[in-house]
From Swiss-Prot:
Keyword Transmembrane helix tagged: no
Record-linked HAMAP family: DXP_synth
Top-rank EC class of the record's enzyme: transferase
Cofactor: how bound: Binds 1 Mg(2+) ion per subunit. Binds 1 thiamine pyrophosphate per subunit.
Residues that, per the record, bind thiamine diphosphate: H72, G113, H114, S115, G145, A146, N173, Y284, E367
A single GO molecular function term of this UniProt record: magnesium ion binding
UniProt-recorded name of the protein: 1-deoxy-D-xylulose-5-phosphate synthase
Segment forming the signal sequence: none
InterPro entries attached to this UniProt entry: Dxylulose-5-P_synthase, THDP-binding, Transketo_C/PFOR_II, Transketolase-like_Pyr-bd, Transketolase_BS, Transketolase_C, Transketolase_CS
Residues involved in Mg(2+) binding: D144, N173
Reactions the enzyme catalyzes: D-glyceraldehyde 3-phosphate + pyruvate + H(+) = 1-deoxy-D-xylulose 5-phosphate + CO2
Gene name linked to the record: dxs
SMART domains tied to this protein: Transket_pyr (SM00861)
Entry's family note: Belongs to the transketolase family. DXPS subfamily.
Amino acid sequence: MDLNKITSPSFLKNLNKKELEQVAQEIRTFLIEKCSVTGGHIGPNLGVVELTMMLHKMFDSPKDKFLWDVGHQAYVHKILTGRASQFDTLRQFKGLCGFPKRVESEHDEWETGHSSTSLSAAMGMAAARDIKKEHNYVIPIIGDGALTGGMALEALNHIGHAKTNMIVILNDNEMSIAPNVGALHSVLGRLRTAKEYSKAKEELESLINKIPVLGGKLASTAERLKDSLKYLVVSGVFFEELGFKYLGPIDGHDFEALEMTLSHAKKVKGPVLVHVITKKGKGYKPAEDDTIGNWHGTGPYKIENGAFVKSETKGPAWSSLIAETVRKIAHEDERIVTITPAMPVGSKLQGIQQDFPNRFFDVGIAEQHAATMAAGLATQNMKPFLAIYSTFLQRAYDQVLHDIARPNLNVFIGIDRAGLVGADGETHQGVFDIAFLRHIPNMTIMMPKDENEGQHMVKTAIEYDGGPIALRYPRGNGIGVPLDDELVALPIGSWEVLREGKDASILTFGTTIPMAMQAADMLAQQGIDIEVVNARFIKPMDKDMLHRILSNHKPILTIEEAVLKGGFGSGVLEFAHDHGYLNAIVDRMGIPDQYIEHGNVDQLLEEIHMTAEDAVARMQVLLQQKQQVGLNK
């Protein structure tokens, strides 16, 4: 069939097994072809084709509510709800979002991008349904990786206690992004291999029900016998102990098994968990064979052999550079312990993991635990390196503030994907960390201008013993500068002048330095002499340099690829005010008070007026203001 002509999932209700299998194959072919051009989360989506089809066949969306945890596995859902024709624009500027989006479709009931949120949201929707005396199903779909998140476990506890009518689909593919870790993963592993459990339990219950009632003693014995079977077959029936009816595990690629089990689940009163076993990447061999997470989310690739299409780059990947520098120093410093919340592949930590298995901890999708574990290590004079994406550090804010910074512990926080990240969009843009870290006492924040300075900042962070220190580094690759062989620690709070200039100053750091230098070149052609400062320490700032610039009455333009509210530019304004420079002429360029959508980073910067041309225009206004207030020197 022509997938582009689908307008509603209702067509699935009349299809037989053979027809369903044909549609499933067409969807897989479609996804493989489209994602080979745009990139995307191909592995997770190939694994949920049959499951998604059967959910839409057995339930009535949008009346019945589907909540896709994380949301990266919702491509099939988008195809079935009439958006196949938009897949050429997947994750592109102004195109189809890679995650559920309420403005896209009435079928996207829950927006997400971060993990472990679906169960809590589902509890809220179910509670609203019950309060309003409505009758519909609420169906969160959560992966075994996301289920390790503390928020998901909190929600399971509440849902089971409240006996809320809800059908939880556990999509178990044994991976989140990288292979899963933890005790819960082991529990699920036992359930996967205990497929005879459900059958045996049903047979035993049937047998017990046929026994005549001869008194409480026999009934009690029978109940103990049932309980004994549970614990003999599966050590710790986790979900049933939490108050859920457990159904499964079942083959998530078997239409008949899915139909039978979902039909049963619809009849259950109270919460039910359907445990579905799926194969991540099913139907495309390179993705099926992936055991470490390379095919979780990809860029473009060649369909015939699965080779990734690499863009031209000059320098090493930032994640690789930082991780490799930590690895080298860790060979000399046994205090260094690396922690990651389920991102060993994304943050390029495999080398550290291989060299130091006893000093490497992948804690799963557990950012709060990761941060406080780092604090615990620091109390014992270890040097924890917490490698975490900027967007996921948001989830550990209280732990950073309360457990790390308040006791002033020496924790090195590597903030990966700092700044705009592009195609993953508003849920993943790393633009908030400066604002929520800068106001925390004892915190040091830095960001390098290039990869050479980046490796020196790793050395700085490891040697620093004055409290927590955060090193921000962007997604993508460096600019290709030579790397020094010998690493040195930088003076904390020191800036450097990259370009002398008497008329005005641009203060910036990290990825926006090339833009600032370009703007200075453009202004030089107009006879305007601009100083460009690498404000590499966002906190503490270089007070001596700020005093020099402000006392000379030089207009200042700050540029940051981060939110303006509470950001670096705000810090410069605060400094000017607090030190009596009440006539300071300061303007700020950065991320406005809005969420930034998906798209190419250059397109996004142009959209929010953060280009060299915009910097030139703003600087011209500043210089005019200087003339108007009569501060010419």
